């Protein structure tokens, strides 16, 4: 039997990796071995950062809510507790968006929390 080197399969696989490595600097977008190593690292970064993104956005929302709450003379923790007591079911993403896009609406929400705590 003749020896099979898998030319078309190998070329297709290498071409796919080099396509994924487009935009990388130096040999990492030209040479298969370097490109393959960098693509593997990039996959690890992407996996890690998909999880970190959730934490980062939550931190951003909390910072925005806290800033808007303090402009309405209430701390973040008291605002959240007041909303829980008042049975206002708004998540942090919605509150942060409200704080940025509609300060008057956020003021009404903050007043609701204050009344629930009083």
UniProtKB/Swiss-Prot annotation:
Listed Gene3D superfamilies = 6.10.160.10, Ribosomal protein L20
GO-annotated cellular components: ribonucleoprotein complex; ribosome
Q: Name one GO molecular function term.
A: rRNA binding
* Keyword set includes Cell inner membrane: no
Which UniProt keywords are given for this protein, alphabetically ordered?
Ribonucleoprotein, Ribosomal protein, RNA-binding, rRNA-binding
GO annotation terms (biological process): ribosomal large subunit assembly; translation
- CDD domains, sorted: Ribosomal_L20
According to its UniProt entry, what is the function of this protein?
Binds directly to 23S ribosomal RNA and is necessary for the in vitro assembly process of the 50S ribosomal subunit. It is not involved in the protein synthesizing functions of that subunit.
- Record protein name field: Large ribosomal subunit protein bL20
Q: Which organism does this record belong to?
A: Lacticaseibacillus paracasei (strain ATCC 334 / BCRC 17002 / CCUG 31169 / CIP 107868 / KCTC 3260 / NRRL B-441) (Lactobacillus paracasei)
């Amino acid at each position: 039997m003749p020896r099979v080197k898998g030319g078309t399969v190998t070329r297709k696989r290498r071409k796919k990796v080099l396509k994924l490595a487009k935009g990388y600097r130096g040999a990492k977008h030209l040479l298969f071995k370097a490109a393959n190593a960098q693509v593997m690292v990039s996959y690890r970064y992407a996996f890690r950062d998909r999880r970190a993104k959730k934490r980062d956005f939550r931190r951003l929302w909390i910072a925005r809510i806290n800033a808007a709450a303090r402009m309405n003379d209430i701390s973040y923790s008291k605002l959240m507790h007041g909303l829980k007591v008042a049975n206002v079911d708004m998540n942090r993403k919605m509150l942060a968006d409200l704080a940025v896009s509609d300060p008057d609406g956020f003021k009404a929400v903050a007043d609701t929390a204050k009344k629930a705590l009083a």
